[in-house]
């Protein structure tokens, strides 16, 4: 596998960054799969004491939003609003907002963040 020629970003060449851009594009196209994988983890690794897993909670929230006629942005936000809970339980709201920010409206992002 090709690698960059630098150890500090400021020393990168045009060729380094062209190669990285192509590799990053490939990585970005797998975002949905990584989110799916994290949702599956939420079904397996949830906080004790609750009647349902974090995955079930997200699915219930998204289903309720969809049944209420919410647009896709709100349904996605309802599904993913706790996506950061496993890594950042004290500030998972901000983490979730940053994850969905490129894909949904600013209003939806703001609600998830706050």
Positions of predicted regions on the chain:
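Metal-dependent phosphohydrolase cores
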Residues: 1-114
